[in-house]
Amino acid sequence: PWLVIPIARRRMRQLVGHLILDSDGEALHQLLDDARARDRRLNLNLLGEAVLGAKEAERRLQDTMALLRDPMVDYVSVKASSVVSQLNPWDFDGSVERLVGTLRPLYRFAVDAPGQSSRTAPPFINLDMEEYHDLDLTLEVFERILSEDEFMGLEAGIVLQAYLPDSVAALDRLIDFARDRTARGGAPVKVRLVKGANLSMETVTADSHGWVRAPYATKAETDANYLRLLDRALRPDVADSLRVGVASHNLFSMAAAVELARARGVDKQIDAEMLQGMAPTQQKVIQEDVGRLILYTPVVDADSFDVAVSYLVRRLEENAAEENFLHAMTSVDESERAGGDGPSPKSPQSPMSGQEARFRQ
């Protein structure tokens, strides 16, 4: 093993180098340069497992701050659970205070950054969401920080997961907060709408405790709720207060968002968001149509590449699922590939036709 494992790790990094980058590597700066040349933005997310102690939480916080200090970086995601250890759901108020105190320096740096570097605008901080039990906590922390006077002029964002039924009430809460904030002279906020990528862990947690699962039971329910969230967010009376990141590789969902926004005259309200390294052809077409494209880009510390495995497993699990859009998009019948009589993409038997049928339901 001492001989094979280092070789396997190097090969693994070569294979997934287009999906996950070193946080301080030359490849990241090359990618940032390329994104800027293509008029794209990269949303950098520092990968890592759940923190168990204060020392690891502090290290993760400093690593995130190091990303923000890089003048080429203008967009960073951070999870509440990654910078504070041992969050206790029974001590909600205490957990909020700890998180606000820990995250405040990141937002303060963003406010001060344009005056301290070549930046012309503050870097964007996106408060990420993962586990269901962090939903209310993350919402409260987000609102608490952005309600402080020193951050009223800072535009920042938060994530909502459509596979949680609670996301509808959460979005309504964020809309009210955003409208109140802009009415008081503050900057708009942004909500990044995702389908949700933590289903397996939510299932394990619920089943091991005998609880009802927090997410929807089916992909169809999640997709329907995603459209419900888009319908509530993309409105003329909200557009000046709330920006919407439409984060999906499902072209039906993306098209629905774009057409809805255009029909309501709020097409400038949305950003198209996709995953770095996945479906580049579709990314190009969507950027040409929408005009604004943000790529979610995972990065890892060079010495901690092992933490990227869980992210890669989630991506593999999602893309391998037959109900997933990317699976349907890349599924080509073997006989068709060989020039046979397999079903065409428009055939009722094709995976893509199945995707369209579920969308129209």
What are these regions (language model features)?
Residues 1-361:
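Positively charged, amphipathic and often flexible ligand-engagement surfaces
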